[in-house]
Amino acid sequence: MSRKRTSPNRNVQIADQIQRDLSELIMREVKDPRIGIVTIQSVELTPDYAHAKVYFTALTGDPDKTQEALNHASGHLHNLLFKRLHIHTVPTLHFHYDQTIEKAVEMSRLIKEANSTRAKDDDEAGAPAKDD
């Protein structure tokens, strides 16, 4: 007997739907004061849909406290998703703070700093020597 495999496209569709639903549910249904303005960046599902890594950014509040609060509310969010999604297995939610934006800003800063240092070194190397 062959096992039915899920298509990668279906996995992406379900992850996208979970992302949209979680964004709405967190905004409307979760009343934890530790959770400020949150954006769900992406959702990664395991092939069997048993677990979902949910990556978020927080515009306000402490990211660690927000992550703790979201993981605390994950059971409630799981139940709300179960009522919305029409799939056999609704994944267990695991929230992770997405540091992509901070890392990109830091990389840009480092590149800018390296370029300005290089330009300064080039200017000093190309400048004519002063006569006293």
Curated annotation (Swiss-Prot):
Q: Which SUPFAM superfamilies match?
A: Ribosome-binding factor A, RbfA (SSF89919)
Q: Does the keyword Cytoplasm apply?
A: yes
Statement: the UniProt record of this protein carries the keyword Amino-acid biosynthesis: no
GO terms in the biological process aspect are: maturation of SSU-rRNA
Cite the entry's keywords alphabetically.
Cytoplasm, Ribosome biogenesis
Q: Which GO terms describe its molecular function?
A: ribosomal small subunit binding
Q: Which GO terms describe its cellular component?
A: cytosol
* Gene3D superfamilies the UniProt entry points to: 3.30.300.20
Q: Which Pfam families match?
A: RBFA
Question: Localized where?
Answer: Cytoplasm
What does the subunit comment say?
Answer: Monomer. Binds 30S ribosomal subunits, but not 50S ribosomal subunits or 70S ribosomes.
What does this protein's UniProt record list under function?
Answer: One of several proteins that assist in the late maturation steps of the functional core of the 30S ribosomal subunit. Associates with free 30S ribosomal subunits (but not with 30S subunits that are part of 70S ribosomes or polysomes). Required for efficient processing of 16S rRNA. May interact with the 5'-terminal helix region of 16S rRNA.
The record's section on NCBIfam families has:
rbfA
Family, similarity comment: Belongs to the RbfA family.
**What is this protein called in UniProt?**
Ribosome-binding factor A
Q: Which organism is it from?
A: Burkholderia cenocepacia (strain ATCC BAA-245 / DSM 16553 / LMG 16656 / NCTC 13227 / J2315 / CF5610)
Q: Show the taxonomic lineage.
A: Bacteria, Pseudomonadati, Pseudomonadota, Betaproteobacteria, Burkholderiales
Q: What gene name is listed for this protein?
A: rbfA
